[in-house]
Regions:
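Aromatic-Pro/Gly-enriched surface loop or interdomain linker
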Residues: 5-91, 240, 248-252, 304-305, ...
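Catalytic grooves of carbohydrate-active enzymes
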Residues: 279, 286-288, 401, 462-533
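Helical hinge/lid and interdomain linker segments adjacent to catalytic or ligand-binding clefts
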Residues: 53-135
Length: 612
């Protein structure tokens, strides 16, 4: 038997089980490291930026990546500096990652106090130095790894504006099954300070202190532990659910920072998370991982089109028989995939053998290709001849070869099992997006850049879109639509997205349930496929923008540049807008501005006049 590969090469095979398939070569790319110096990567460019004072000196300081994730996901403008004077020229300052006796001189401590007294605002984490006790409002602190829970106080404060649900008012730092979890610093507050959140031992987790015209906030946790550690799934099982529930354990700290920025920023502006001035987005997807899962996909596509929606089909390209299932990546299933693509659906990869042991696979050489790559599932979670590169790269080559105009850049692992080498394999194989975690498991409902090696030092080029709702948990998706809708609405309150995974193994009960869900969605929640939104998010995350005053009163100039094509970018303003130029559209509330479509490399300048 022979198989036609990209470029017309014909392979001679001895295995009669391998079908004849076309491939399109996926070049093996080299890892390109981003600018290593955060000071150069995030420079000062306009007055509204939050100043991040990177307090760690030395040759190996703690990376500000967790804070970068938090601020970029919320669309908050910022720059990073080690210059205290430069930071204090801005109205809002974040001290990151900590402050000890070596961080500031007594003179600099006085400068910080004067800054706050005169109307400045500081957000800091892990302040240990006695020289700043009076400013931050604490008497002492105790570092421990035995605190497992955190609860916000009943006292209302501006930074807790978005924490209105029970799941947001209390969170878990780690499962009780672990005697020790992340480090936390419990503070004993001064009489004048206010405790906004406390740990399970009663010590203060988040406190605030007013000094003169300004205010400081102090967090006894590290964003590395409560944001990035969750996102790369190295937490101590801090999630309260695995899937199908509202779990904002990492999001609450992003929302606290957003509320802090909006409460104290002067004429603040924020890059919104959802396109077109909408409130949220429902991202629909289907896993096609069984021989009878192809035809029902057409029914889902028809229903979605009738409801002005779309979806992404993650396809298992199984061309080998093994202990787990038969091969099915051949006609007539390939014809169905082509119909789905031609009808407007988007297609991603769902690996080749869909192994429960994928998280234990070796990375591989990167030279794996069809048909010489012959993986086999041997049992529940064991396999032979399988690598991460093979599952990722070869499946892309097959999808790109068999579906006209297909460029596979989205991946979802079988059984959502994630090896630490997945970001590298995806990046080097030409992917841009992944959806292999659940939102509950990583305690994150906003998309985020996936760190290389699932570590703490550097982001890969891959963006993660974790699964919020799936269909297989008992009693099944058809009986869980009301619950799913409540989770979607909870995310919508925060401007987060919800990813829905429905296996296309049958289209009677599940398709009817999907239609029921779509018909109940509020009109300000976008219904779209995953790939379309993912491209928007990538362009948003990489956007360069600034807002500066013009020579005219009540007029500012918004300068925006995108390296990628993007539609629907939206900015949110504190002050109501009166007029805008440049083809931008104001929302009815006069506080959101939707930009026209941006071409790659295009820079636009929009003049904005405020209403008041």
């Amino acid at each position: 038997m022979s198989a036609l590969c990209g470029g017309g090469t014909v392979w001679k095979l001895t295995s009669q089980a391998t079908p004849v398939l076309r491939t399109k070569a996926a070049p093996l790319l080299e890892i390109v490291h981003k600018q290593a110096d955060p000071l150069q990567q995030f420079p000062e460019s306009f007055p509204l930026q939050v100043a991040v004072l990177w307090t760690n000196p030395g040759s190996d300081p703690e990376n500000p990546l967790p804070l970068v994730h938090s601020l970029k996901e919320m669309g908050i403008p910022f720059f990073i500096t080690r210059d205290l004077g430069q930071a204090l020229r801005h109205h809002l300052v974040i001290l990151y990652p900590s402050v000890d006796s070596h961080t500031f001189t007594p003179l600099q401590a006085d400068q910080l106090t004067t800054f706050v007294r005169q109307g400045g605002f500081i957000f800091a984490q892990n302040v240990f130095w006695g020289g700043l006790q009076n400013l931050f409002g604490f008497r002492s602190f105790a570092p421990l790894r035995t605190r497992h829970h955190l609860a916000f106080s009943a006292t209302k404060d501006a930074v807790t504006k978005y924490l209105n649900r029970a799941e947001e008012r209390e969170t878990q730092l780690g499962s009780d099954q672990f005697p020790e979890v992340i480090w936390s610093n419990g503070y004993v507050p001064d009489a004048g300070a206010e405790v906004l959140a406390h740990f399970d031992d009663g010590s203060a987790a988040l406190l605030t202190n007013s000094v003169g015209k300004g205010k400081v906030y102090l967090l006894g946790l590290s964003l590395l532990d409560v944001v990035l550690r969750n996102q790369n799934n190295h937490d101590y099982e801090a999630q309260r659910h695995y899937v199908n529930a509202f779990e904002p354990g990492a999001d609450i700290w992003l929302l606290v920072l957003r509320a802090w920025y909006e409460a104290y920023g002067r004429d603040w502006v924020r890059l919104a998370t959802i396109p077109g001035g909408q409130r949220s987005a429902l991202l629909l997807s289907h896993d096609v991982d069984w021989e009878n899962s192809f035809a029902p996909g057409l029914d889902f596509a028809r229903i979605e089109k009738a409801n002005q929606a779309g979806s992404t089909f993650f396809v298992q390209t199984k061309y080998v028989d093994d202990a787990n299932s038969k091969a099915f990546f051949f006609a007539p299933n390939l014809d169905i995939l082509r119909q789905l693509k031609a009808g407007g659906s988007t297609v991603g990869s769902h690996s080749i053998i869909h192994s429960r042991g994928f998280n234990k696979f070796e990375l591989g050489s990167g030279r794996e290709t069809y048909p010489s790559y012959q993986p086999r599932g041997l049992g529940f979670d064991t396999a032979s001849g399988a690598t991460v590169f093979g599952e990722v790269r070869v499946s892309k080559e097959l999808l790109d070869g068999e579906i006209p105009a297909q460029d596979t850049i989205f991946f979802r692992a079988g059984h959502l099992r994630v090896p630490v080498s997945l970001p590298e394999a995806l990046e080097r194989s030409g992917y841009q997006f992944d959806s292999s975690f659940t939102a509950d498991d990583v305690l994150s409902n906003f998309p985020f850049a996936l760190p290389r090696n699932l570590g703490f030092e550097e982001d890969s080029e891959i963006y993660e879109f974790p699964v919020t709702i799936e269909d297989e948990e008992p009693p099944g998706f058809a009986k869980r639509v009301p619950q799913a809708l409540q989770v979607i609405l909870a995310n919508a309150e925060n401007g987060a997205v919800s990813v829905v995974l429905i296996h296309s193994n049958e289209s009677t009960l599940k398709a009817a349930a999907e239609q029921d869900l779509l018909r109940q969605l509020p009109s300000d929640i976008v219904k779209t496929d995953m790939l379309t939104f993912a491209k928007f998010w990538r362009a948003r995350d990489r956007l360069q923008w600034s807002l500066t005053p013009s020579s005219l009163p009540s007029e500012v100039v918004l300068q925006v540049e995108s390296n990628e094509s993007v539609t629907g970018l939206t900015f949110e303003f504190q002050r109501p807008l009166a007029t805008v130029t440049g083809g931008a559209i104001m929302s009815p509330d006069n506080r959101h501005l939707v930009l026209p479509e941006l071409a790659p490399g295009r820079s636009i300048s929009i003049r904005i006049n405020y209403l008041d």
